[in-house]
Amino acid sequence: MIAVIIGCEIGFWVLLLLGLVVRYLTPARGLSKALLIAVPLVDVVLLAAAVLDLRGGGHATASHGLAAIYIGVSVAFGSQMIRWADERFAHRFAHGPAPTRPPKTGRAHAAHERAQWFRHVLAYVIGAAVLGVFTLLVGDIHRTVPLWGVMVPWAVILGIDFVISFSYTLSPRRS
């Protein structure tokens, strides 16, 4: 399962890079659209691989839990990552405008950090929902305990992210 997760992560970035190369360095707009549309399908491949493994009698492991984390993060942050890469590629290869940068100071920075934390919460909820589906597919809560083991460290990370993100609300960075 770990190999599938790594393959999907590589696939995400390869499809994104190819889509941007084709978009900005060739006249093949249709191919570019197809490649960029295929980027989120990597999540579907990962989800299908995990489901097939569990339905086929595979043991529910922490790697299935990592697959759920990957899917949650990809759904919550994927469009933002694609936009980030697109802005930089357009600027570098198509003489587009300079990429937008998040605010570094003041209330705008605090608002940005809070928004990113809420996006992190969305990723966590999606990951938990995927784990819930995996648990239902296995049909035995005792066999799926290793799946849920990934949620505790993730909750700690989410808590640390909360403290850092919301600290800027109480004490904004000064310019």
Predicted segments with their positions:
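N-terminal signal-anchor/start-transfer transmembrane helix
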Residues: I6-T26
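Long, highly hydrophobic alpha-helical transmembrane signal-anchor segments
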Residues: T26-G72
